[in-house]
Amino acid sequence: MGQLPGAGVFCRGGCGFSRLLAWCFLLVLSPQTPGSRGAEAVWTAYLNVSWRVPHTGVNRTVWELSEEGVYGQDSPLEPVAGVLVPPDGPGALNACNPHTNFTVPTVPGDWGSSVQVSWLALIQRGGGCTFADKIHLAYERGASGAVIFNFPGTRNEVIPMSHPGAGDIVAIMIGNLKGTKILQSIQRGIQVTMVIEVGKKHGPWVNHYSIFFVSVSFFIITAATVGYFIFYSARRLRNARAQSRKQRQLKADAKKAIGRLQLRTQKQGDKEIGPDGDSCAVCIELYKPNDLVRILTCNHVFHKTCVDPWLLEHRTCPMCKCDILKALGIEVDVEDGSVSLQVPVSNETSSNASPHEEDNRSETASSGYASVQGADEPPLEEHAHSANENLQLVNHEANSMAVDVVPHVDNPTFEEDESPDQETTVREIKS
């Protein structure tokens, strides 16, 4: 088949993958004439066989309307006809000996001469030589074509022969049963004539084992791929649902915690409105009278409209990251179960508390938040009195230390401004 116009120019010009793929499809799907061969095309052959008994004038013609043979991969796709002639000798059916001869019938010619009729070599497959050797020998002996029948035991199975270098004459393969029947007729002295015509074109030639293997492999790969995607999708869906449930639960807990936080309306004279007053860390605006503010457990103050949406999503202070759920002792449900975080909201501190504990910030924030909640009442004297009562003596062999413990504060400077009467005193007594 000739090259499609412009195909070479496109490929030499660095064509894109999509354009090259389109050209390849055109090359594969383009129609082919019977005189040309596709790389994977298989052409069948229609056979018209006639039997003629010598000296009796009786002709027996059998029309074969089915696909009886297969053209070789290197054979010309042309019709051909002739008398079938097997190799001479009982052991020469394979035609592997280069000296093999064929006894070709003749017909009377002009001036009393005899002329060989057009004939086709009938050769059996096998014998230790290739298809090309058999076909080339038949061509050298003057045959118009070669008819090769399959091994014994293969019934009427045929394959597309590969015979490079031996494409001078038509070569087809027929089944063993068909070839044996013709051979037996010839051996009984019956002249057999065969007319070969081009049949139908078929796709790539594959045997039953290849089809079975490809089908099973495709099924396994498809099943594995579908199973993986089902498992992956189910896992993602389960994780998404669990995450959604967790987020909804956390938002519900955050709403509960926000409802327990203190609200206060700013009035003229509050320290947040004074000359040294701070601004809201969320909107960066100064506090004004009648502003509604939210006081968190860590004593940080924000506009209610600014901090409430933040707390719903993050549940922590925008400045110090103090967890309001832990500080208020609200139970937090997680995926594996329910964990209750109970944090005492009081001014008392255990004498053996480690400064490296993870919940120290929450306890500190809770203590400070309790002091802010009672800012409008007179609890400062009670705090100072309680702090003086929390004097403990800790003995460590040769050294002893007495510590005055006051309520924990998250921001000492802020607490000193709010309650200047409180002091933190640490006395170390060495014995």
Curated annotation (Swiss-Prot):
GO biological process assignments: protein ubiquitination; ubiquitin-dependent protein catabolic process
Enzyme class: transferase
Keywords: Cytoplasm, Cytoskeleton, Glycoprotein, Membrane, Metal-binding, Signal, Transferase, Transmembrane, Transmembrane helix, Ubl conjugation, Ubl conjugation pathway, Zinc, Zinc-finger
Membrane-spanning segments: 211-231
Zinc finger (RING-type): 280-321
PROSITE patterns attached to this UniProt entry: ZF_RING_2
Residues modified by glycosylation: 48, 59, 101
UniProt-listed Enzyme Commission number(s): 2.3.2.27
Membrane found in the keyword field: yes
Protein name: E3 ubiquitin-protein ligase RNF128
Lineage, top ranks: Eukaryota, Metazoa, Chordata, Craniata, Vertebrata
Residues spanning the signal sequence: 1-38
Subcellular location(s) per record: Cytoplasm; Endomembrane system; Cytoplasm, Cytoskeleton; Cytoplasm, Perinuclear region
Metal-binding recorded as keyword: yes
Function: E3 ubiquitin-protein ligase that catalyzes 'Lys-27', 'Lys-48'- or 'Lys-63'-linked polyubiquitin chains formation and plays a role in different biological processes such as modulation of immune response, cytoskeletal dynamics or protein homeostasis. Inhibits IL2 and IL4 transcription, thereby playing an important role in the induction of the anergic phenotype, a long-term stable state of T-lymphocyte unresponsiveness to antigenic stimulation associated with the blockade of interleukin production.
Polar residues composition bias: residue spans: 345-354
Domain notes: Binding to E2 ubiquitin-conjugating enzyme requires an intact RING finger domain.
